[in-house]
Design a protein with these regions (language model features):
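Gly/Pro/Ser/Thr-rich low-complexity, intrinsically disordered segments predominantly at protein N-termini
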Residues: 1-149
Length: 149
């Protein structure tokens, strides 16, 4: 008999690629294509310029983890973000970013994607995120949920 347990941040550290913990499950996200990747990069570059100009916060690019403490979510990994908290060294950032961006990929359209996006936006705001540009889906049709054993 196989039993599964709730995924932990430590599981994320051992997972290759981009992943988040949602409802206790480790959710892997597929790499994105040219256009959504370029859009995320451009937003990161704008946030980086803002951080340099204002000497406040940090622009955070894709594939970085933010550790949060919600009943249904333990982490975020936005496509771009602005963070004002302490440096985290080799670990995930603690808490949600001040501003987060999710860029919509090819499979991130339709009614179910809109519902997931609305839930992820609500999760960001519950964690203290001051703004979220929801141009993507927290889980597209191509994402994979892994059981944690």
């Amino acid at each position: 008999m196989t039993t599964t347990r709730r995924a932990t941040i430590e599981d994320l550290y051992e997972t290759a690629g981009k992943a988040e913990i949602v409802n206790g499950e480790l959710v892997l996200r597929e790499p994105t294509g040219d256009e959504p990747g370029f859009a995320g990069d451009e937003i990161f570059a704008s946030l980086r310029e803002h951080a340099k100009r204002t000497k406040s916060g940090r622009a955070v690019g894709d594939n970085k983890g933010f550790r949060v403490h919600l009943p249904n979510r333990d982490s975020f990994s936005p496509d771009a973000a602005f963070y004002v908290g302490p440096r985290a060294g080799m670990k995930f950032f603690e808490g949600a970013p001040q501003f987060a961006v999710e860029v919509r990929s090819e499979n991130d359209y339709g009614e179910n994607a809109e519902k997931r996006l609305a839930q992820k936006r609500a999760d960001y705001f519950c964690c203290g995120d001051a703004g979220s540009l929801g141009r993507g889906s927290p889980r597209s049709q191509s994402d994979q949920v892994l059981p944690v054993k």
